[in-house]
Amino acid sequence: VQTNFVLGLDSDAGEEPFELTKRFVDKTPGAFPGYSLLTAFGEAAPLNLEYQREGRVLSFPFPFLNNHLAMNLKPKNYEWIDFYDKVIDLTEYTFSKKAIWRRFIANKGTTPKWMNFMRAVSQEGHGRIRFYKQVRKNLLEDASFRNYFEGQSKQLPSFYINIIKEDLGAWWQWFPKEAIEHNAYAYLHKKETSTILSVA
């Protein structure tokens, strides 16, 4: 069984959402928690219009809109460092040796036991912890990186460009460079234009 959680919702504030999620991990050891960072997907949700009106949507290109590589929405009730501190703490708690062992013995059958174990010790568990720690480090030490996260710059940090390069390998040379840039407010502009046209 996998249980899915979205971190960074506008209703979240303080320690409570993260601490209560830890209690869930304790109370349901057989479940595999899947954590997603809140992501605004274009026109998929009308709520995205509100986010765009508030100027909170970031211009992360499509390769990073996978719920964990980037959160393309500035949190409403957290500063970035504080948010990543809490995400890292929760993820470390969820994929600690103790939690992995409890999940292993709570599940019946060889396949779910070992599948959950491998997910925990590979990219989905320990891999994400390493990644989130690097993002936090960049937020602290790299002003241009932080400016992008604060919406003060639209220049995608080289950290993320290098991820795309690594993923594409030899195909990077054919990747259209304009695809790195993305209008995060296209939905809002489209709505405003259609409203003006309908009034006219």
Identify the function of each model-found stretch:
Residues 125-200:
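C-terminal non-catalytic accessory extensions
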Residues 120-123:
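A cross-kingdom feature marking charged/low-complexity
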Residues 1-116, 139-140, 197:
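A structural motif corresponding to the C-terminal lobe/cap of the Radical SAM core domain
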